[in-house]
A protein has these predicted regions:
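Signature of N-terminal electron-transfer/Fe-S-associated modules in redox systems
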Residues: 1-158
Length: 158
């Protein structure tokens, strides 16, 4: 059954009609062409699909698009402002917090939430905060380093 939904995505009002079974991640990727949100496991285990809903990190593969009616959604594409990377995105680039890049959008979205909740997070707290995100390439060292770089307020080189 098709249903209408209205929400705000990356600061823009969106009204679409979707199948009631459409997952939020499918809606973002297929209806809005926001392909930075990745589908990894499709079971809310890997975190590749992490986006922010009303300022909180969620796994978009575990929510129906209809469940976000009236919400504000921010995807990885919505973090950058006026052509400038978000400080966390810049930190990941600066500190080589990625290899293949598949997990990076979800990792960045989770990291932004992590520091919003705990700006003075220790390395252990950062590692615990990334618990819901899986990276098969990096071993997490440079991911943690990236988050600490952002946390320090240091500016990434251009």
């Amino acid at each position: 059954m098709d249903i209408p939904i209205s929400l705000t995505v990356n600061g823009k009002s969106v009204t679409k009609t979707v199948d009631s079974r459409t997952l939020l991640v499918q809606f973002l990727r297929e209806n809005l062409q926001l392909t930075g949100t990745h589908v990894g496991c499709d079971t809310a285990q890997c975190g590749a699909c992490t986006v922010h809903m009303n300022g909180r990190a969620i796994k978009s593969c575990s929510m129906l698009a209809a469940q976000v009616q009236g919400s504000q959604i921010t995807t990885i594409e919505g973090l950058a402002k006026n052509g400038e990377l978000h400080p966390m995105q810049a930190a990941f680039r600066e500190c080589h917090g990625l290899q293949c890049g598949f997990c990076t959008p979800g990792m960045v979205m989770s990291a932004v939430q992590l520091l919003a909740d705990n700006p003075k997070a220790t390395e252990e707290e950062i590692r615990e905060g990334l618990d819901g995100n899986i990276c098969r390439c990096t071993g997490y060292h440079n991911i943690v380093k990236s988050i600490q770089f952002c946390q320090s307020g240091a500016k990434a080189s251009a």
